[in-house]
Design a protein with these regions (language model features):
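Extended low-complexity intrinsically disordered regions
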Residues: 1-65
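Acidic, serine/threonine- and proline-rich low-complexity regulatory regions
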Residues: 39, 71-72
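An amphipathic alpha-helical micro-motif enriched in hydrophobic residues
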Residues: 47-58, 73-108
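Long, hydrophobic, amphipathic alpha-helical segments used as structural scaffolds
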Residues: 62-65, 94-101, 116, 120
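Conserved small/polar residues in nucleotide/adenosyl-binding loops
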Residues: 139-145
Length: 145
């Protein structure tokens, strides 16, 4: 298969939102969100930071599992430090959403209890979400756009 990379780049540009490709549109959107009380600065810090720190945590796990890195005190300490960094960004997200970590955990427990009515993991329920499960709402909402 031959790929026309120029055509692909045109396609990517066409399906990219204005705030993602135009600095003025981006700045306008940030101001719009600020007017709505959306904590863009905290949530962007949290989102980018969680992604980066999760990558660092994953890198250590990958090296232990697939590349022979030893399971030793130093590597366990490294994992714990990366997990702490993740928690710092989770705290940023909580502040940006004006929610406590306790509330986040409680909401997660409620969601999982609803998803797994037997109180334990079930492959069927993990693959077949009930109506109203957030993943399905997001998918439906995105599909409608």
């Amino acid at each position: 298969m031959t790929v026309n990379t120029d055509a692909y780049l045109e396609f990517v540009n066409a399906v990219t939102s204005q705030p993602s490709k135009d600095a003025d549109a981006f700045e306008y959107r940030i101001q719009e969100l600020r007017g709505e009380g959306f904590e863009t600065h905290r949530l962007l810090t949290a989102a980018v930071g969680m992604s980066a720190e999760a990558g660092e945590f994953t890198e250590v796990v990958k090296k232990i599992i697939f590349q022979g890195k030893p399971v030793n005190e130093e590597n366990m300490f490294h994992l714990k430090r990366e997990l702490g960094d993740l928690m710092w960004y989770v705290a940023q997200a909580c502040m940006g959403l004006n929610i406590s970590l306790d509330e986040v955990i409680e909401m997660n427990v409620d969601k999982l209890k609803s998803r797994y009515p037997g109180g334990e993991f079930d492959v069927h329920y993990s693959e077949n979400r009930k109506e109203g499960d957030l993943c399905c709402l997001l998918y439906t909402s995105d599909a409608a756009d």
